[in-house]
Design a protein with these regions (language model features):
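A generic structural motif
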Residues: 80-82, 234-239, 266-271
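Substrate-binding cleft of extracellular glycoside hydrolase catalytic domains
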Residues: 38-218, 228
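Glycine-rich, charge-decorated loop segments at or immediately adjacent to ligand/cofactor-binding or catalytic sites
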Residues: 115-122, 242-254
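Functionally critical loop-and-helix segments that line ligand-binding/catalytic clefts
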Residues: 38-59, 64-65, 70, 250-325
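Aromatic-lined carbohydrate-recognition surfaces of secreted/lumenal glycan-active proteins
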Residues: 227-248
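Long, charged/polar, surface-exposed segments that mediate recognition or autoinhibition
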Residues: 217, 224, 238
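Secretory targeting and sorting signals
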Residues: 1-33
Length: 325
């Protein structure tokens, strides 16, 4: 939560100031002091950090109303577009409802992922083949003879993996061409949901031990297409482990398109997180959102929701005017 301005609190407790000489220094009335202190506290709250949460499926209108008025001041929520690696559609059509309630939003598009593999890399699998096997058999007479028999035996072979039939999310789909196609999908769905021109779309890129060239090509192409279209702004959800590399890559793409401002980054890292910290405390100057508590369950106003907890620089991370005004 935002840090309290104790000078403001002190103003509520003092109606006048007595110095050592015994002279009373005139001060505003207690009513004026309360008004001034309240204004300063409100300023602190509006300046952030702003607490938000994300959850896989839409919790329901009643749940969102309950949480907005709860004791814990969540101000914004992750808004999942249906996407290749997040096919749930429960958030669709809820933008206006959430906006009317007063929720800020962060638009999320979960694109293709590597899932710990390298796109196009051949993998070893076990296959069974029939082989003619030479056997030596001892007869009753004691004589040994050679015979041949067909047997099923395991062998290791290298194969080029394929996406499962009907799948929309696969390591094998990670490529520049798919990055462009997924950007078009994200643009169309953001527009269909009624988000204003200039809305920030966060491309969800999950943690990778190594970032294959195909993945770098994928998110670069995604970025270039969103910029080329011009209706929305590209942004990125990334793990702290990969954030610096991704940032450098997309900055190059943006610079080549004449964009000089930093792209918004939403960084995931549990280390050192607290809800009164600001996003840059995660360790990156370009961080605008920090996700630090994952897979927790909270109950507010009697409504229980499994969530990830985030802090942001803005009360509505995807808004055109992200101060929510």
């Amino acid at each position: 939560m935002p840090k309290t301005d104790w000078r403001s609190i002190l103003a509520l407790l003092t109606g006048g100031l007595i110095v050592s000489t015994g002279t009373t220094i005139p001060t505003p009335s207690i009513g004026d002091a309360v008004t001034a202190a309240s204004a300063r506290i409100a300023d602190n709250l509006s300046n952030g950090p702003h607490l938000g949460f994300d959850t896989f499926a839409y919790p329901g209108d009643d749940a969102m109303r309950a949480w907005l008025t709860a004791d814990k001041p969540y101000k914004w929520v992750g808004y999942y577009l249906s996407a290749p690696c997040h096919t749930d559609t429960t958030w669709e059509g809820k933008r206006e409802t959430l906006s009317n309630m007063g929720w800020g939003m962060a638009v999320i598009y979960v694109g293709q992922q590597t899932w710990g593999r390298t796109p196009g890399e051949r993998i070893a699998v076990t296959r069974y083949v029939t082989k003619r096997v030479r056997q030596t058999v001892k007869l009753k007479s004691g004589k040994r003879v050679v015979r041949y028999a067909n047997k099923r035996v395991p062998v290791r072979v290298l194969v080029s993996p394929r996406a499962s039939p009907g799948s929309t999310c696969s390591t094998q789909f990670v490529s520049a061409a798919r990055g462009t196609a997924d950007a078009n999908d994200a643009i169309a769905k953001t527009a269909r949901e009624g988000f204003a021109s200039g809305t920030v779309i966060f491309l969800d890129i999950e943690r990778m031990e190594n970032v294959p060239k195909a993945m770098r090509d994928y998110y670069r192409a995604w970025t270039a297409r969103v910029v080329e279209d011009g209706r929305f702004r590209p942004a990125y959800y990334a793990h702290n482990f990969n954030a610096q590399l991704i940032y450098g890559d997309v900055k190059e793409v943006l610079a080549s398109a004449g964009v000089t401002s930093d792209p918004p980054f939403w960084i995931a890292s549990e280390r050192g997180f607290a809800i009164d910290k600001v996003p840059t405390d995660v360790g990156h100057a370009f961080a605008q959102v920090w996700q630090g508590l994952l897979d927790v369950v909270e109950t507010h106003n009697g409504v229980r929701i499994p969530i990830d907890v985030n802090v942001a620089d803005f009360p509505s991370p995807s808004a055109v005017d992200r101060n929510g005004e």
